Amino acid sequence: MSLVLIHPAPDALWADARLEGVLRHALAGREVRTLRRAEELDSLRNQTLLFAVPLGELGINLEYIRMLARLRREPSLLEGCTAGLIVDGAGELYTKSAATELALAVNAAGCALLGRPLVEGTGSLANFAVQAHNLGTDLAGAYRAAARELVDRLEGETFPRRELPNLLALHASSHHTSNTMALWGQVRPQLEDRFSTREIGLRNGTL
C-alpha cells in the first residue's frame, strides 16, 4: 500500500531537522509519496495519509497554515482517506493545540483518523520518558519507535464500509422546547440518504 506523506515545508530548515530523522526511521522500506505545499493537496480521495508537521519556535508553520486553510475550505478534499498525525515542536508548547486543530480539519474534510492517531514530539521530548524507560532506550529512540509504530498501524488499518450504516439517536428532550432536538431536526434530513436512522426518546425513565 502506498502512503502519502503530507509534510509542510518549514519556515526555517532547522525546524525540520529532528522530524526528518524521525520520518526516515518510520518510513524506511516503504513506498511513500511526499507533498510539501498546500497546492499539492489534490486527488487524495481514499488514500492513506501521514501528516508530519514541524512547528517553529513560536508554534507556527506558514505552509501548514495554508494547508489548514485549504482543508477547512474544501469539505470533501480528503473523502475516504485514513490518517495519522506527527507534530514536532521546538518548545514545550503548541504541539497539542496544533494537533487538535489539524485533527478537526482533516476529519471535517472527510478523513477518518486512526485510533490513537497522534505522535507528539515536544522540544525536550519529556513526554516520552515512560516509553523510553519501557523500551530501554533514550527519549529520541522512543520518539522514533512511536512514529514507526504509528505508521505500522496506519498501513494495516481497514475501516469497515457499509452501504447504509445504522444511526441511532437517543434523547431525553422535548421536541417543542429543546435546542438540541431542533438542531437534530435540521441535521437528520441531510443524513437520511446515507444512513438508516432511528430515533428513541428516553423520558421519565421509559424506553
What are these regions (language model features)?
Residues 1-198:
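FMN-binding flavodoxin-like domain, especially the glycine-rich phosphate-binding loop
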Residues 204-207:
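Cysteine-cluster motifs in flexible loop/terminal segments that predominantly coordinate metals
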Residues 201:
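Conserved acidic residues
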